[in-house]
């Protein structure tokens, strides 16, 4: 199976997936994807779509607190600090993907989680752009 190596290929793979999902819809009516990786949100969407293209599953993890209107302040989410932005599974292998754009750096809590995931047999990766992430994933599955 060919795997995406860059955003252009990921968009093509994603379009093929959509064509398969909507086989009764004419091709011209199927929306084309325009995935980018300039912001954290865009890169996160790319990675989740990449997991789907590779036959896996992935979920975005929201560790942000919840605004309590009654109290007028934010409450902690209850999620453990340092959990990766994306968790996913491909062929039974657990992945924890931390998305970092620009000068964003890994926190001490995130380093602890990285060690725990690796010690448990999972794979942890810090994604800064889609191309480097795709090279890493293609190396894992080569």
Where are these regions (language model features)?
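Catalytic phosphate/metal-binding cores of nucleic-acid and nucleotide-processing enzymes, i.e., regions
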Residues: 1-142
């Amino acid at each position: 199976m060919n795997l995406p190596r860059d955003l252009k290929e990921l968009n093509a793979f994603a379009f093929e997936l959509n064509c398969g999902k909507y086989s009764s819809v004419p091709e011209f009516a199927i929306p084309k994807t325009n995935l980018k990786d300039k912001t954290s949100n865009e890169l996160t969407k790319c990675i989740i779509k990449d997991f789907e293209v590779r036959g896996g599953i992935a979920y975005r993890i929201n560790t942000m607190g919840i605004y309590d209107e009654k109290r007028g302040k934010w409450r902690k989410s209850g999620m453990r600090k340092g959990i990766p932005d994306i968790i996913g599974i491909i062929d039974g292998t657990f992945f924890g993907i931390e998305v970092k754009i620009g000068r964003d750096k890994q926190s001490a809590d995130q380093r602890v989680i990285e060690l725990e995931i690796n010690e448990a047999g999972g794979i942890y990766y810090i994604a800064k752009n889609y191309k480097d992430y795709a090279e890493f994933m293609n190396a894992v599955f080569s």
